[in-house]
Amino acid sequence: MSYVPTIVQAYEPKSEVDLYLPQAHMRKWNLSSPTLTVQFGSKQVRARVSSMDRTNRTLIRPSIAQSLHLPTGIPLLARYQANQQSLVFGPYVGVLVSTYNAQFPQSPFGPLTPFFNEVADICRKRGGVICAFRLQDVNWDAGIVRGLTRVGSVWRQRVLPLPQCIYNRLVSRQRERSEQMTNWVQRCKDANIPFFNEQFLNKWHVHSALENQEAAADHLPSMVRYQSLDDVKNMLSAHRVVYAKPANGSMGRGIIRLRRTDQGYQLAKPGGLTKTFSSIQGLNQYLSKQTKGKPYLLQQGLPLIGIQNRPTDFRVLVQKDRKGEWAVTSMVARLGQNRIVSNISRGGSMLPPQQALRLCGPWVSGNRPTPQTLRAVALKLSVLLEEALPGNYAEFGVDLGVDVRGHVWLLEVNSKPSKTANTVPLPEGEEEPPRRARPSVVRMLEYAAYVSGFPRAAKPKPKPAAKKIRRR
């Protein structure tokens, strides 16, 4: 199975031929049959084929292109499957979104528009189609989707077949847990459409999935569900500091710090609000009101390193690559604006990890980990987590903390890491993000191409320069 780059052009032939293929491609595929099946996404038709000389373009009868809902005039890849005598165009990647505004064709996705433009730029350069759509845009019975694709510099609605794979970027946990979504995901599986990053991760589910795995347990802080006074009492008896975290929370929202002091107990929230209590009953009563019946977890407080009393953690982006294997794409240190959370969305800032580890402290016994250590831990935990969870995942934002003794702890795992442009630290001296595709966007598309049947080959390593022989 091999593929070649091409541009498909609509052309009304005078003969009965439906599809003209470059002669070089037909020789490469050893294609001699006068007819074959042409596929794009979920659509396929039989077509009569012939060859053309001196071109890498593919000419297609307009009625065939319309039956396939195949865009023309754009770079694509073509893959011939000899055992099925079929020609497949792609890769065709669908992105499931919560919403978009087609009335603003230059920025229909709001702050996520730059991300989608990056994806479209890569597709235009390497070949492929990207289509963003909502749940209600899909007609399963007809096998079509009405979504947004980029035409030039604007995004337009058009009808396409069901994609070869779907990347889940829904932002609503409630929508994702709906019966509609459950049925929708099952329809994807029934249609053999890879659907990755299947759902948001719950902190408790992550902890439960890893706590019984020997290779992961050493990196997990103690954690229990917050259900009663006894939970607070037991955790604060075992640990001087405990964090109450929303089980379904994100971006550092709703985190509360509980501390046992010589005078009683202290509760602190982001923003500087602090309250003291003489009894644990009073603390629990106030905490119960703050959590408002939402599922909360109690997590052991850790003596994490920081910079000038600013909490510091490390976000490691781990993604599946062009071979479907987990790999670390990027890592950044995040400094909190307050002493409770370090999330960038809550006013934090970023540093390169090497610089952060150099500036952070205090260290006990000089056991300072290296960035390579953090990468290795994040990679190991990602592999173990995917093995333990149901569903298909292709990227995790792994949040790690490092304590003063150099031990690495897992703080959180996010299956929908942010795609806004402010989540990567800029090189020193640069004030604006570079106008090139981020490695995370490239890797996501390479994995999507892989599951679509268009795995991208690695670039060959340059040969070492021949050594010059000195004449004596």
Give short role names for the model-derived ranges.
Residues D18, K294-L302, L379-L384:
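Short Pro/Gly-enriched beta-strand edge/turn motifs at strand-loop
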Residues M1-F89, V97:
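Short beta-strand-centered segments at strand-helix junctions
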Residues F89-P108, I166-N168:
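Short hydrophobic beta-strand segments
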Residues S107-D231:
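Conserved N-proximal alpha/beta basic substrate-recognition cap immediately N-terminal to
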Residues S228-D230, N234-Y243, A247-L351:
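Phosphate-binding site of ATP-dependent enzymes
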Residues N101-L112, R175-E179, A421-P433:
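Short, flexible/disordered intra-domain loops and linkers
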